[in-house]
Design a protein with these regions (language model features):
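Generic beta-strand/beta-sheet core signal
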Residues: 21, 47, 62-66, 99-100, ...
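Residues that mark the start of a beta-strand
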Residues: 15-17, 120
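Phosphate-binding active sites in nucleotide-utilizing proteins
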Residues: 28-65, 71
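C-terminal and late-domain segments of enzyme folds
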Residues: 13-14, 26-36, 43-45, 137-170
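Conserved small/polar residues in nucleotide/adenosyl-binding loops
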Residues: 3-10, 167-171
Length: 171
């Protein structure tokens, strides 16, 4: 498996092209984060996990932000070509940052509040759930355990958390 270890602050090689999920299911984006990526020289290209059949071509990274995938679980599940493309590219080494709804989408299954279970991208072995209420709220400190697109190894930074979901992993 090929590993890509590029930091967005490293502009010596080339600009990075980042695919950003944006549609009715993935609509909770932080514009400040997107502005930071653009100011760092990244080209952002948007796609819809609901409507597009595959990811954009020639991308160096993938952002799956939050939203309401549980409200669109059936449609997301039916878009098999997109689910398979995302899974295949991540398994081939495409860096991906997924949060909240995007994290749920990467599971094998997503269970809705109505207890309906739908297949998703299958990167994370288990089922993601929307709890229907806030689990925690506040700020946290994060320390990178390896070089990533956003931080160097051992770099610490602050992050905001307000999860409304949880996961049951399987062995």
């Amino acid at each position: 498996r090929r590993q890509r270890q590029m930091c967005i602050r490293d502009r010596k090689k080339r600009n990075l092209r980042i695919a950003v999920a944006k549609d009715e299911a993935f609509c909770f984006l932080y514009e400040d984060n997107l502005d930071y990526l653009r100011q760092s020289g990244c080209e952002l290209t948007y796609f819809s996990p609901l409507k597009d059949s595959i990811l954009p071509e020639n991308i160096d990274g993938l952002l799956l932000y939050g939203g309401y995938p549980e409200l669109h679980a059936e449609e997301l599940s039916e878009n098999i070509s997109m689910r398979e493309d995302i899974a295949g590219r991540i398994q081939s080494g495409l860096p991906c940052i997924a949060e909240c709804g995007g994290f749920l989408y990467l599971h094998e299954y997503l269970e809705t509040l109505d207890k309906e279970k739908y297949p998703m991208a299958g990167i994370i072995r288990g089922t993601g759930y929307n709890a229907g209420k806030l689990q925690r709220f506040g700020y946290m400190s994060v320390k990178a355990v390896k070089n990533t697109m956003l931080a160097d190894k051992n770099q610490s930074f602050r992050a905001h958390e307000f999860p409304v979901s949880y996961t049951h992993l399987r062995a």
